């Protein structure tokens, strides 16, 4: 008698169905929030970049109920922190006024804090893109320039008369400037080159680098353009948007995230144990929503 739960092909007398990879690595992705429209937004290139490398993307919700994340985080094999609006300057001890800053998104910032604390604690592979890299730096004790065009000398060290366009007007799938890769960094080894042409869509950037991170790339003007954490398996951030080149020379960045996520699940580094983010009184167990110099 055939097992009623067997695959349809087997029930029909055919060969048992073969599943090449029954568990794709699950990558939790942080969306942007459009507060005025009361909606979450995520550009398709993020999704395509993960799926094209064999990952299963899951868009995470923004909620004040931490029990939701307690249920979701243990299911994630890796995380992707995406680009988006400015980070609240209060998060990195800045009282400078920036008239160009975006409306803060507190729920998104809290989610990103929880992810980074969880990923650091359990060594869960995490990639930060643009704002995601900035949040990574801020969370682990670094600071930001609130507006590069007001606070940073935007010139090419090799061509002083040529200003750097960190917020390009051209199509986002076109590069706007080069970055210099640190060859002995994980990113430099993955890309196997000294200079990389990247796009650029940001007006903020790393000012003081977190003591837990090391630079992996610099812009022509000396701005830190990529970071990584030496004592974690895969904790990396890039200031540009590699998802627009994910089917070209930057696919290796997403492949590394997905492969490390799969390895983390196999090794047991990603915990499936019940997770408590909040205490019984509703306070935050890990106190990760206040930025600190020490983790």
Feature roles, as predicted:
Residues 1-129, 137-145, 149-197, 203, ...:
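N-terminal beta1-alpha1 cap of cysteine-dependent amidohydrolase-like domains
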Residues 236-239:
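Active-site-proximal beta-strand elements of phosphoester/diester hydrolases
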């Amino acid at each position: 008698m055939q097992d009623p739960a067997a695959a349809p092909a087997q029930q029909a007398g055919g060969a048992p169905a073969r599943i090449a990879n029954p568990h794709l690595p699950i990558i939790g992705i942080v969306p942007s929030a459009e507060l005025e429209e009361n909606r979450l937004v995520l550009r398709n290139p993020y999704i395509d970049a993960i799926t094209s490398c064999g990952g299963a993307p899951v868009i995470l919700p923004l909620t004040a109920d931490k029990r939701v994340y307690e249920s979701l985080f243990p299911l994630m094999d890796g995380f992707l922190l995406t680009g988006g609006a400015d980070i609240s300057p209060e998060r990195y001890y800045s009282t400078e006024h920036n008239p160009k800053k975006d409306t803060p998104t507190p729920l998104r910032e809290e989610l990103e804090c929880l992810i980074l604390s969880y990923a650091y604690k359990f060594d869960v592979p995490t990639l930060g893109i643009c704002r995601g890299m900035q949040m990574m730096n801020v969370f682990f004790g670094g600071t930001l320039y609130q507006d590069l065009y007001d606070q940073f000398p935007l010139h090419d060290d090799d061509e002083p008369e040529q200003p750097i366009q960190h917020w390009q007007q051209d199509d986002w799938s076109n590069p706007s400037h080069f970055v210099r890769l640190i060859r002995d960094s994980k990113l430099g080894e993955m890309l196997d080159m000294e200079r990389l042409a990247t796009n650029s869509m940001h007006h903020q950037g790393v000012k003081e680098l977190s003591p837990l991170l090391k630079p992996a790339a610099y812009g022509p003007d000396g701005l830190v353009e990529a970071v990584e954490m030496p004592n974690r398996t895969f904790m990396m951030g890039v200031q540009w948007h590699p998802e627009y080149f994910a089917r070209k020379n930057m696919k290796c960045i997403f492949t590394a995230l997905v492969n490390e996520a799969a390895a983390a699940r196999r090794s047991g580094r990603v915990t499936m144990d019940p997770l408590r983010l909040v205490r019984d009184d509703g306070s935050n167990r890990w106190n990760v929503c206040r930025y600190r110099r020490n983790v």
